């Protein structure tokens, strides 16, 4: 699980992960976004994603693509994340 260090919620519940694919060679491609283009924790979050996925034996390599479309909004958060952060 990768926790956003600024918000304290995992990136899946925050709605930051858009797509995950693993090909036949075990290469995992993750399309994800950040809460803002200037997010100072972006490189740290990407490193954490790669570290967590490297623990899965079937994953041989990981590519993390930061995408800005669609733009992230609080509406993408799970109910859990909204409650935890006090967002309605």
From Swiss-Prot:
InterPro entries: Fe-S_Maturation_MIP18, FSCA_dom_sf, MIP18-like
Top-level division of the source organism's lineage: Bacteria
Membrane-traversing stretches: none
Disruption phenotype: Cells lacking this gene have decreased activities of the Fe-S cluster-dependent enzymes AcnA, LeuCD and IlvD, meaning a defect in the assembly of Fe-S proteins. They are capable of growth in liquid chemically defined medium containing the 20 canonical amino acids (AA) and glucose as a carbon source, but display growth defects in defined medium lacking leucine and isoleucine.
Induction (free text): Transcription of sufT decreases when aerobically cultured cells are shifted to an anaerobic (fermentative) environment, and increases upon reaeration. Up-regulated upon culture in serine dropout medium relative to liquid 20 AA medium.
A matching Pfam family: FeS_assembly_P
Family stated for the protein in its record: Belongs to the MIP18 family.
Function of the molecule: Involved in the maturation of iron-sulfur (Fe-S) proteins. May function as a Fe-S cluster carrier. Is required for S.aureus growth under conditions that impose a high demand for lipoic acid, likely via a role in the maturation of the lipoate synthase LipA. Is non-essential for growth in conditions that impose a low demand for lipoic acid or Fe-S clusters, such as fermentative growth. Also seems to be involved in the maturation of AcnA, LeuCD and IlvD proteins, that utilize Fe-S cluster cofactors, and its role increases under conditions of high-demand for Fe-S clusters (respiratory growth).
UniProt-recorded name of the protein: Fe-S protein maturation auxiliary factor SufT
């Amino acid at each position: 699980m990768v926790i956003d260090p600024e918000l304290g919620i995992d990136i899946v519940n925050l709605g930051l992960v858009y797509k995950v694919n693993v090909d036949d060679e075990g290469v995992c491609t993750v399309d994800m976004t950040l809460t803002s283009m200037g997010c100072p924790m972006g490189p740290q979050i990407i490193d954490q994603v790669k570290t967590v996925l490297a623990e899965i034996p079937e994953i041989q390599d990981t590519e993390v693509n930061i995408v800005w479309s669609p733009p992230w909004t609080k509406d993408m958060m799970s109910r859990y994340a909204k409650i935890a952060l006090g967002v309605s």
